[in-house]
């Protein structure tokens, strides 16, 4: 997944935790236009520069933008973190053209890490990480926290599900570590039993 240098054939899963919203959206928008399929998980952990009060005031100003005669015609004000991020990416893509619509269709966004993506290797994007891009000491807030302040009702539910997922993941890791240890022990015992026969096996590259 490198912009302009080639397309990865399989879908890329990006862990959005502690990435800056705009920087992450711009990189993903470019990849989508290049033909890459992208899944973004943990959207509630995306960072916005500026404190929570400031960001909430900005969002409340955005809520006042509507069509006077028929507000349901737009603009649509999303509350869920995944949909807010999706809209940010949409703003960086010519989504009203055929190419742009196809690019946007290649994007999937989620709060938390739902199956089957909990068993898939996830990647980060260094160019968008908060620790590398936000000035030290600068205020920031999480997108999930902002969403919960403006009408998103599932913040606590997602947090509970994430705790359960991490517990399952830790148990799986411990089991895998134990199996690796047993395998290494079994290989050592086999080497001691085989002795000189190992040289014969090595010569035929077994």
Curated annotation (Swiss-Prot):
Domain of life of the native organism: Eukaryota
UniProt cross-references to CDD domains, sorted A to Z: Ribosomal_L13 (cd00392)
InterPro entries in the record: Ribosomal_uL13, Ribosomal_uL13_CS, Ribosomal_uL13_euk/arc, Ribosomal_uL13_sf
Xref: HAMAP family: Ribosomal_uL13 (MF_01366)
Assigned keywords, A-Z: Ribonucleoprotein, Ribosomal protein
Alphabetized GO MF terms: mRNA binding; structural constituent of ribosome
The UniProt record lists the keyword Disulfide bond: no
SUPFAM superfamilies in alphabetical order: Ribosomal protein L13
UniProt similarity note: Belongs to the universal ribosomal protein uL13 family.
NCBIfam families referenced in this protein's UniProt entry, alphabetically: L13_A_E
Organism: Arabidopsis thaliana
Official protein name in the record: Large ribosomal subunit protein uL13y
Zinc among keywords: no
Pfam families in alphabetical order: Ribosomal_L13
A single GO BP: translation
GO cellular component: cytosol; cytosolic large ribosomal subunit; cytosolic ribosome; plasmodesma
């Amino acid at each position: 997944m490198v912009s302009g240098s080639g397309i990865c054939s399989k879908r890329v899963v990006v862990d959005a935790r502690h990435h800056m919203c705009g920087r992450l959206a711009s990189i993903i928008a470019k990849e989508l236009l290049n033909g890459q399929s992208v899944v973004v998980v943990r959207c509630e952990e995306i960072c916005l520069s500026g404190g929570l009060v400031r960001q909430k005031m900005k969002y409340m100003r955005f809520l006042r933008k509507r069509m006077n005669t028929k507000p349901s015609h737009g603009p649509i004000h999303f509350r869920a973190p995944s949909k807010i991020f999706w809209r940010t990416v949409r703003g960086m893509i010519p989504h009203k053209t055929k190419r742009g619509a196809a690019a946007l269709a290649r994007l999937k966004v989620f709060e938390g890490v739902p199956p089957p993506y909990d068993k898939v290797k996830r990647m980060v994007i260094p160019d968008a990480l908060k620790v590398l891009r936000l000035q030290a000491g600068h205020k920031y807030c999480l997108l999930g926290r902002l969403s919960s302040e403006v009408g998103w009702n599932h913040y606590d539910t997602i947090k509970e599900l994430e705790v359960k997922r991490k517990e399952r993941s830790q148990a799986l890791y411990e089991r895998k570590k134990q199996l690796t240890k047993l395998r290494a022990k079994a290989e050592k015992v086999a080497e001691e039993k085989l002795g000189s026969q190992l040289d014969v096996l090595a010569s035929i590259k077994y």
